[in-house]
Regions:
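Short, glycine-/Ser/Thr-/acidic-enriched flexible segments
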Residues: 32-33, 97-99, 140, 202, ...
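Internal helix-turn-beta structural module
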Residues: 296-371
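Long, well-ordered mid-to-C-terminal structural blocks that present hydrophobic/aromatic surfaces
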Residues: 225-270
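Dual-mode signal for accessory low-complexity, basic/Gly-rich regions
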Residues: 258-325
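Active-site bordering "gate/hinge" segments
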Residues: 1-228, 366-371
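Active-site lining segments that contact anionic ligands and/or coordinate catalytic metals
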Residues: 228, 244-246, 253, 279-283, ...
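Short solvent-exposed loop/turn micro-motifs enriched in small/polar/acidic residues
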Residues: 10, 179-181, 224, 240-243, ...
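Short aromatic-centered micro-motifs
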Residues: 188, 250, 345
């Protein structure tokens, strides 16, 4: 066993979810590569007399189920796991896929039913709102290949980004959180992007290893009908096993009224037609992890890229709620660092970030070189 899993598990149990004696914790592994970490979590949970429960989801089994399932089958599957989740006080989810096409062959209709009757019910409505939870990936050959690294190189990267000094990050985030809570108008200008919206009255929140590992973001949400202009994202993103590039959204009064994506505009619109809320924004956040520099086409890493922000169609964050409701929550990232084209972010007409660097004195501790 990689002994770095002991430190990671300690951070998960004591920092991320603050697990207590007699609490039920569901350790869910999606893909068998994550079992080594799951076993360490179960071991340490038992030491403090918590009650761990293990659920292993095999991607191939899930794929075959969805291909053959009726709508009623998916609804029953969701109801069953919803009842299990209701009994949990804590949750750790470990994902270890082996392919970009884990759900290849599942129709868009089935994926939408799965998102609506399983993901939304079990995770968005129950797990997110009623448990202490954290989700993370597990380092394997798949992630190493996506990162253009050897497995050992990726493991070193992984444990660096996961075991960053979150206490230092937490302190450095406070001035940004305070500024966001005082801000009305946000204006973002970058190649293919001229976007404005209000965040007035929407609470900002710091994320420093509590819900995601790796972590590092400060997030809020636009006032629902305030988003106007257009944005072109400069990272690849995956949703429902489809990889999208060069996504552009055009907004009028908060609604995405026009979309394009390289060779995938039809599929993009199908996702945004999931429900009425899918065409409105549910999160605006800065990525701040000093060790995450480039996209992996994996949201859990990409949304933490330093010098980036994400603007998220779909369900609003509970902590920064603008009232938007949807079965989707899709974090799509735009990197503002100079090598990615640069860009500027203004708060109430004051420049706060240029080319991925905070320029206000009170925010400079959040720049990557100061968080390492």
């Amino acid at each position: 066993m990689d002994n770095r899993n002991e430190k990671l598990t300690h951070n998960l149990i004591y920092n991320s979810i603050s697990l207590n004696e007699n609490e039920n914790i569901l350790v869910e592994v999606i893909g068998e590569d994550g079992l080594e970490l799951a076993n360490e979590i179960i071991k340490q949970a038992k030491i403090i007399n918590a009650k761990p429960h293990l659920n292993i989801i095999n991607y191939e089994d899930l794929r075959n189920f969805l291909i053959n399932a009726t709508k009623e089958d998916i609804i029953e599957y969701g109801k069953k796991d919803y009842e299990i989740m209701k009994k949990m006080q804590a949750y750790i989810g470990i994902s270890a896929p082996t392919s970009d096409k884990s759900l290849n062959g599942v129709s868009q209709e089935k994926l939408e039913l799965y998102n609506k009757y399983y993901i939304a019910l079990v995770h968005l409505d129950q797990r997110v709102k009623h448990t202490k939870w954290c989700i993370l990936r597990y380092p394997n050959e798949y992630f190493a290949q996506k990162s253009n690294m050897t497995l050992n190189e990726f493991k070193d990267f992984y444990y660096n980004v996961c075991n960053v000094d979150y206490n230092k990050m937490k302190i450095a985030m406070e001035p940004l959180k305070k500024l966001m809570n005082q801000t009305d108008k946000v204006h973002i200008v970058a190649p293919g992007t001229d976007l404005s919206f209000s965040i007035k009255g929407i609470p900002a929140e710091k994320y420093y290893g509590t819900f995601n590992i790796p972590d590092g973001e400060v997030a809020t949400c636009p006032v629902k009908d305030s988003v106007n202009g257009y944005i072109t994202y400069n990272t690849k993103t995956k949703y429902n096993d489809i990889i999208f590039e060069d996504i552009r959204f055009d907004f009028i009064y908060g609604e995405i009224i026009k979309t394009t994506a390289k060779e995938k505009t039809k599929e993009l619109n199908e996702i945004l037609d999931t429900d009425d809320g899918a065409r409105y924004i549910g999160e605006f956040a800065f990525g701040l992890n000093p060790y995450v520099n480039n996209t992996m086409c994996d949201t859990l890493f990409d949304e933490k890229i330093n010098g980036s922000f994400h603007l998220t169609p779909g369900m609003a964050l509970e902590e920064s709620d603008n009232g938007n409701r949807s079965a989707i929550h899709w974090d799509i990232v735009k990197i503002l660092r100079k090598e990615f084209g640069g860009g500027e972010i203004y708060f109430d007409d004051i420049l706060i970030m240029k080319d991925g660097k905070f320029i206000l004195e009170e925010l400079k501790e959040l720049n990557a070189e100061n968080l390492k």
